[in-house]
Swiss-Prot record:
<keyword id="KW-0694">RNA-binding</keyword>
<dbReference type="InterPro" id="IPR019979">
    <property type="entry name" value="Ribosomal_uS17_CS"/>
</dbReference>
<dbReference type="GO" id="GO:0003735">
    <property type="term" value="F:structural constituent of ribosome"/>
</dbReference>
<protein>
    <recommendedName>
        <fullName>Small ribosomal subunit protein uS17</fullName>
    </recommendedName>
</protein>
<keyword id="KW-0687">Ribonucleoprotein</keyword>
<dbReference type="GO" id="GO:0019843">
    <property type="term" value="F:rRNA binding"/>
</dbReference>
<keyword id="KW-0699">rRNA-binding</keyword>
<comment type="function">
    <text>One of the primary rRNA binding proteins, it binds specifically to the 5'-end of 16S ribosomal RNA.</text>
</comment>
<dbReference type="GO" id="GO:0022627">
    <property type="term" value="C:cytosolic small ribosomal subunit"/>
</dbReference>
<dbReference type="InterPro" id="IPR000266">
    <property type="entry name" value="Ribosomal_uS17"/>
</dbReference>
<dbReference type="InterPro" id="IPR012340">
    <property type="entry name" value="NA-bd_OB-fold"/>
</dbReference>
<dbReference type="Pfam" id="PF00366">
    <property type="entry name" value="Ribosomal_S17"/>
</dbReference>
<keyword id="KW-0689">Ribosomal protein</keyword>
<comment type="subunit">
    <text>Part of the 30S ribosomal subunit.</text>
</comment>
<comment type="similarity">
    <text>Belongs to the universal ribosomal protein uS17 family.</text>
</comment>
<dbReference type="InterPro" id="IPR019984">
    <property type="entry name" value="Ribosomal_uS17_bact/chlr"/>
</dbReference>
<dbReference type="GO" id="GO:0006412">
    <property type="term" value="P:translation"/>
</dbReference>
Length: 92
């Protein structure tokens, strides 16, 4: 891989979240939570957003903690790709 391609790949945004749905084919829904400080009151509030991410091999299951990376649009709602598994889901 050339140096320019390497830096372009590293400039993509990455987020870490939890898989909340794996019912679609080659797609997982990832819930990303982040803490933001309220502008007036100063209290930290938990904000969350769901992203559809591409899972080529259908290998990620519900409850897995994954890292997703921004990519080209693959469908109307899907422009993120799962890059790696951070932590597997614990089976109780």
């Amino acid at each position: 891989m050339t140096e320019a391609a390497q830096t372009e790949k590293s400039l993509r945004r990455t987020l870490v979240g939890r898989v909340v749905s794996d019912k679609m084919d080659k797609t997982v829904t990832v819930l990303v939570e982040n803490r933001v400080k309220h502008p007036l009151y100063g209290k930290y509030v938990l904000r969350s957003k769901k992203y559809h991410a591409h899972d080529e091999a259908n290998q990620y299951k519900e409850g897995d903690k994954v890292e997703i990376q921004e990519g080209r649009p693959l469908s109307r709602t899907k422009s993120w790709v799962v890059s790696r598994l951070v932590e597997a889901a614990r089976v109780i």
